[in-house]
Curated annotation (Swiss-Prot):
Organism: Dictyostelium discoideum (Social amoeba)
Name of the gene this protein is made from: eif3C
Function of the molecule: Component of the eukaryotic translation initiation factor 3 (eIF-3) complex, which is involved in protein synthesis of a specialized repertoire of mRNAs and, together with other initiation factors, stimulates binding of mRNA and methionyl-tRNAi to the 40S ribosome. The eIF-3 complex specifically targets and initiates translation of a subset of mRNAs involved in cell proliferation.
Name this polypeptide is given: Eukaryotic translation initiation factor 3 subunit C
Any Gene Ontology CC annotation: eukaryotic translation initiation factor 3 complex
Any single biological process term in GO: translational initiation
Length: 936
């Protein structure tokens, strides 16, 4: 074509554009063109008001969708966004001119009514996060609704206004769309009449393509269809865009030749079509998306009336093979990085509603259950509705297997060995059952205890028990006894801790004790026969626990000793170690209830204090300086048992302290200075810490009360001791209180009698048995038995007088007396040794000379003895002569001779006195060793 014609066409188009300035027409380009490029859409510039109003409209839609599924987490999020947006400065200025946005008021009204009308049953089904959001929005919603009470009043008076306005708007839009599509079809039909036989001279296919996918007429009030279809918009948009892009490419290629030549002469008519198409596109931007989704029905829509198609543009229904092919595609994407589990669940649920045939139904349902488990995580459990769906799904799988006896269940990586007529189906119902059980325990961990919600959730335990019984029967009939044994131990673990006797059990066993014993025996025998070593150990521990809570101490103790599990508990896995600890603690509590104090103390001694982690009732205590191990913390958190299975730590500590008191008090009275006999270290540490205090406060805690009881018991006041013990709070956790108190009273009386004899036996020569019986309120025969046993064990030195029914105590020295005597003997030996050393070093003559200076002292010590009177007089006369000699320095020979005679007599007197004292001490020591009578 010549350049002249092209210039003419451009001038013509410019003149047209000046007359119609609202529509911009793009020049047709050759070789690079597409149907979508030729449809020019107007870019609408929204005002600030329209933008804000549009945000509120979107929030209203999200709120509606969230409330349909009781998703209060999303509702709270949208509510917070709207309240922030409504208080924005720009929004406030617009509201002053235009008023409040209707969508905001509608959203407030919808949230308020939904929050108010939520039933109790619906509240029970909310999971933890959802329930938290439901409670948190209550106060915020009340404050906000009070601020906008005037605007909310019309909707309260007539709630139908919320839907009427939207239905009216939707119907108007549908009428406009219908009229526009009809006008476009009429125009396109007029253009088709003016075409040549093989070419489209005037009309453009892209203009008609934009309205090919018509939206069918909908009824008023059908606004929910848009929100439901939006859930699957992201998936179906890709499918639709591919089909549209392929169609547009084909059309652009086929029409590329038609854009030359004659098209340039008919540019005026062409512009009208383009202009009309652009206007239609601008007004139907959102509607076209929904129309295109309706043009090709997606299997994700989930609508019962929708007809699935085999291809993007084909109208054929999906066959069973095609459905299974799509199911495999969904399964292949499971677990990938950007895969949404919720969307996969929606897809599988839709395919499950379409599938036919038992085998295909089993496969789709099994994969659906596996996908539902993917919604849980390590810390977050399955929501209660999903958990119940999974339980129902497992029941349906089991029904399919029981109905079709020719179906053989095989594992995924197992080669099936089937005979003629049998059908192999892949699945592992045991794994599904174990995961369902674990999710149930995890769900209980996330609920506060004890609350009504916890009790309601705990009622679902019966679902697991019934399902486990059915699965065990199926595996037994299938010959898979190993899997049946694993299910049996799961059933045992839901039964062994229940007893109608336990007060701290939140749900006592509704089954009679005889039936419960029979069931435990039956399941245990099956596990012993077909289970492995680990399952057998767990079964034994569960039976020990079960016998202990039913006060069968001897059976539980014998089972523990015969199994030898206490020899190497560290070789077990962690969960089995926890079960072993629980069995030991419960065995100790049983021994305490039965009156076996020593056995009770031996069992619970290692579990007092902050050792909750040993019983899976809390996290382990770490030092403040230690680094936080998140991996270990997560592992311990997952191992924590549900709260209704816990053994109260206060009960364990109180039993340990009382047992320690009844053991340690008589031991301390018998051997007060021997630390090796202090076996109850936990009790002794507490007593020592209180004794070190300067001021002891009144008793408030259990430990303080037991301290006061110990002091009373040490003094032999058993009545005061019992008064303190009876005020403890642990009695509310003890079943059969009267029987336990009676046994404990008898034990306290016996211990008080022993302590009294150990402490005050040295103060009595003899005592009557009747007096002891009256003092401690014990039968005379029992007192006789206790005293005889103490004498037989050489704990007291006494003899029994049967004629007078009295006890005669033999004198025995106390520890203090023994130490004093030993000290005196050491002093005597020390003096004698010093004298021998003195004689060796200085000689006897020097010591005699030294004694002369001290003779007056030696003589003075025995002044008053008659047979030494003359010697004393001579010695005194010697002192006078010696003084005169020093004063006058004159001495006669006769007096000098008399002086030496008196000196020799004085030395002889000192030696005799020393020998007399030594003999007296030795004889006194001998008398004390033979018999020492102490009178206090």
């Amino acid at each position: 074509m010549s350049r002249f014609y092209r210039q003419g066409s451009s001038s013509e188009s410019s003149s047209e554009s000046s007359s119609d300035s609202d529509v911009q027409v793009k020049k047709p380009t050759r070789y690079v063109s597409s149907s979508e490029d030729e449809i020019e859409e107007k870019r609408i510039v929204l005002s600030a008001k329209d933008k804000i109003w549009q945000q509120f409209d979107e929030s209203l839609k999200k709120v509606r969708n969230a409330l349909k599924t009781n998703d209060w987490v999303s509702t709270t999020s949208e509510f917070d966004n709207m309240t922030k947006l409504i208080t924005n400065g720009k929004t406030t200025r617009i509201i002053e001119k235009e008023g409040f946005p209707p969508s905001f008021i509608k959203a407030l009204f919808i949230i308020q009514t939904s929050h108010r009308d939520l039933t109790t049953e619906q509240k029970k089904k909310l999971h933890a996060n959802n329930n938290k959001s439901y409670n948190s929005i209550k106060q915020k919603l009340k404050k906000t609704c009070d601020l906008y009470a005037k605007e909310l009043k019309p909707y309260h008076d007539n709630p139908a206004l919320v839907n009427e306005q939207e239905n009216k708007a939707n119907s108007d839009d549908d009428d406009d769309d219908l009229s526009e599509s009809e006008s476009e079809e009429s125009e396109s039909s007029d253009d088709d009449k003016g075409k040549g036989k093989g070419k489209a001279a005037f009309g453009k296919k892209p203009a008609t393509k934009a309205v090919v996918a018509k939206k069918p007429l909908t009824k008023k009030g059908d606004d929910d269809s848009e929100s439901e279809s939006e859930e699957s918009e992201s998936e179906s948009e890709e499918l639709i865009s591919e089909s549209w892009s392929s169609d547009s490419d084909d059309d652009s290629d086929s029409d590329s030749d038609d854009d030359s030549g004659d098209n340039k002469w008919m540019i005026k008519d062409d512009k009208k079509v383009v202009a009309k198409a652009s206007v239609t596109t601008v007004r139907k931007t959102d509607k076209d998306k929904l129309d295109r989704r309706n043009a090709v029905v997606s299997p994700l829509s989930g609508s019962g009336s929708a007809v699935p198609t085999a291809g993007e543009g084909e109208g054929e229904k999906l066959t069973q093979d095609q459905i299974m092919k799509k199911v495999k595609e969904v399964i292949s994407n499971r677990g990938k990085l950007k895969t949404d589990p919720m969307k996969q669940i929606q897809q599988l649920e839709y395919f499950y509603s379409l599938i036919q045939g038992d085998k295909e139904t089993f496969i789709v349902l099994y994969e659906l259950i596996a996908a539902q488990f993917d919604t849980a995580s390590v810390k977050v459990a399955l929501s209660i509705p999903v958990w119940q769906k999974v339980a129902d799904g497992i029941k349906k799988l089991l029904e399919i297997l029981e109905t079709n006896t020719n179906f053989v269940l095989v594992l995924e990586h197992q080669e099936p060995t089937i005979s003629k007529g049998q059908v192999a189906v892949t699945g592992n119902l045991l794994a599904l059952f174990e995961m369902l059980d674990d999710e149930f325990s995890k769900s209980l961990q996330s609920i506060n205890y004890p609350t009504k919600e916890y009790l309601d959730r705990l009622q679902d335990e019966q679902i697991i028990l019934d399902l486990g019984e059915s699965l065990q029967k199926y595996y037994e009939s299938a010959g898979n006894n190993g899997a049946a044994a694993k299910i049996a131990i799961r059933r045992i673990e839901h039964i062994y801790y229940k007893s109608s006797n336990l007060k701290n059990n939140i749900i006592p066993s509704t089954m009679p004790l005889s039936e419960q014993i029979t069931l435990m025996s039956k399941l245990s025998s099956f596990v012993y026969k077909f289970g492995d070593e680990r399952l057998n150990a767990r079964t034994i521990l569960c039976n020990i626990y079960f016998n202990a809570i039913n006060n069968k101490f001897h059976e539980a103790r014998d089972m523990m000793l015969m199994s030898h599990l206490q020899d190497n508990p560290t070789l077990m896995d962690v969960s089995t170690q926890i079960l072993f600890n629980r069995a030991m603690v419960q065995l100790g509590l049983c021994a305490f209830r039965c009156g076996y104090i020593q056995e009770a103390q031996n069992c619970v001694v290692e579990f007092s204090g902050l050792r909750k982690d040993l019983l899976a009732q809390g996290l382990s205590v770490q030092s403040k300086t230690a680094e936080k191990d998140t991996v270990r913390e997560v592992e311990e958190t997952t191992r924590i048992l549900p709260a209704h299975m816990w053994i109260p730590i206060d009960l364990i500590e109180t039993v340990n302290l009382i047992s320690g008191m009844l053991i340690a008090v008589p031991q301390n009275a018998y051997r007060p200075f021997d630390n090796k006999f202090k076996t109850c270290k936990f009790y002794q540490r507490h007593m020592d810490s209180v004794d070190r205090q300067i001021f002891i406060a009144p008793s408030e805690t259990s430990k303080d009360i037991i301290y006061q009881a110990s002091k009373a018991l040490s003094a032999g006041d058993w009545q005061q001791c019992l008064e303190h013990v009876n005020t403890l709070r642990f009695w509310s956790l003890i079943p059969d209180i009267d029987s336990v108190r009676e046994k404990l009273t008898r034990i306290v009386q016996e211990v008080s009698l022993k302590t009294f004899l150990f402490t005050y036996s040295t103060s009595y020569d003899s005592i009557l048995l009747s007096e002891l019986a009256d003092r401690f309120h014990l039968p005379k025969s029992q007192v006789h038995s206790i005293v005889a046993k103490m004498m037989n064990n050489h704990e007291i030195s006494a003899s029994m007088e049967h004629s007078t029914e009295s006890i005669t105590f033999r004198a025995e020295q106390t520890k203090l007396q023994y130490l004093a005597l030993h000290y005196s003997e050491s002093l005597v030996d020390f003096v004698e040794q010093n004298e021998r050393i003195y004689d060796v070093k200085f000689g006897t003559s020097y010591r005699k000379k030294g004694d002369n200076d001290h003779l007056p002292i030696a003589g003075g010590q025995h002044h008053g003895h008659q047979h030494h009177g003359h010697q004393h007089h001579g010695h005194h006369h010697h002192n006078q002569q010696q003084q005169q000699h020093h004063q006058q320095q004159q001495q006669t020979t006769q007096h000098h001779h008399h002086h030496h005679q008196n000196q020799n007599q004085g030395n002889q007197q000192y030696q005799n006195k020393k020998h007399h004292n030594s003999n007296q001490q030795k004889s006194h020591k001998k008398r004390q060793n033979n018999s020492l009578v102490v009178n206090n």
